Amino acid sequence: MATQSIKEYSLNFQGYWREANKGGVPSKSGIYLVYRCLYNSEQNTVGLKEIIYIGQSVDAHERIVNHDKLDEFNAKLQRGEELCYSFAEVDEEN
């Protein structure tokens, strides 16, 4: 039986994008997270509540801006929460 080696990756998620500014997600290949968050306007921070989706795309910007599961994501939000996104670049070849 042939064995297949497992490739290991280190992902660097830098920052976050709130639903209102998700257009800032780069048009690059990578892994993205969709999560429930609470935005603190006084401190300009978000508090991660729950990761609700993990995806991959050759163009994360296009995928997130036009995500076909947006209604499903919004249905998971609780009072005062909003959707937030994180992105880690991964070369297309990987």
Predicted stretch roles:
Residues 60-88:
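A broadly used, surface-exposed interaction patch
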